[in-house]
Amino acid sequence: MALKAFSSEVDTGSRQENAPSQSWLIVADDLTGAADCAIAFGRRGRAAAVTWGEVTDASGYRLPVLAYDAASRGLSAAAAAVRHADVLTRLCQPGRILFKKIDSTLRGQPAAETAAALAHLKSRSGPAFGVFAPAFPATGRTTIDGRILVKGRPLEEAEVWRRDHTYSNADLVDVLATAGIRGEKVKLAAVRGGDLKATFARLAGEGDVVAACDAETEHDLHLIAEASLHASPATFFIGSAGLAHALAGLEVSHAVEPLRIPTSASGTLIVVGSLAGASRTAARRLEATGTVVHFPVAPETLLNDGAGRAALAADVMERLAGGGDALVEIMMDDHPDMSLGPQLAKGLADALEAVAPAIGAFAATGGETAAALLSRFGVNGIRLADEIEPGVSLGLTLGRLSVPIATKAGAFGDEHSLIRISERLRAVRTRGSFI
């Protein structure tokens, strides 16, 4: 199914959307990030979907909220900037507000991608103004004095930073400077003071600057969104799902008719490809419930063992076809080779491509893993329906395979997240409704 045609092919009831004036383009560096920002609008009644891959232009996408996965998390700064410039040229139509989704812990190339966004908007409408607020308080990410904290501790001390970081520190102005961007800190006192709108208006008037905003609570993000939305015609936003929820909350909410789908007797495929400790712990908890069969797979199998991959596919297909849920987990040691990520995702997609006809619902942790599998299953988009918990989006895949799907960034959630995801997907596929 073409993504642009989904509205006529999915039963959403007879409601006609009374859309607010804003339309949005969300450009993310991975799939889970694209989804958890888009659902901020989708859960408030805006038609929202995620797509990726080859998209010539946005002329056929009449959605008020379109999110695109640029798949740039693993690229160099120069390559990520080129990819974003190309995406923006094709998809950033006049009238759409740009939301540049970045990782809340600064993985990937957020500075280079932000520079590409500034350059694109400047070429189209003159000096641009960026509002940079990466905080996502619901997942423990805050920003104080222009620096990111994770659960109250400096980002530089967090597991995710030790495992993977691009910059020398987590100071937002320093990060922006690596791409030649002028940043100005807007500290918490200014966010909570009475002159925030004037501060943003001043910076927008200067142009070609990014306001790096503190935020400790969801209300702080609301204040930032409210004061900056109309700061200038060339204002754009840089942040994570926390800021997306704040911006979506400014719009009039509409009653949401739940998506309805045929019921399925096939089981749920749950794939854990993320290295984050949160996902690994959640996998152990889910396995302990006895509601899934655990299929651990070694990196060597995915890289070099064709017979092992075929055996994995046969076992997983048998489980799913019988109505049972399957938990497939890439097993890694304490010192994984991060450079193998794309190869492992491809190997897993090679192994599981054949099980697609037996899938009743699908969940994946880690954007790279999810994107590789979905592309191999013939999926070209996701129509978003709900949010299971902060950072966990629920929707319906579009393309050759149409099943309920949940996506989760690897480091989000707690030890019970996969249990909640499994239970929700089971309910959706057996009831035929996303309620």
Predicted regions and their residues:
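Cap/lid and interdomain-hinge subdomains that line or gate substrate/regulatory clefts
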Residues: 22-24, 47, 51, 64, ...
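Short beta-strand segments
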Residues: 27, 67-69, 100-101, 131-135, ...
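Short acidic, glycine/serine/threonine-rich loops at helix termini
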Residues: 37-39, 109-113, 141-149, 198, ...
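Glycine-rich, highly charged phosphate/nucleotide-binding loops
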Residues: 54-55, 76-89, 344
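Conserved, well-structured core segments that form the ligand-binding/active-site neighborhood
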Residues: 149-312
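C-terminal structural cap/anchor segments
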Residues: 316-365
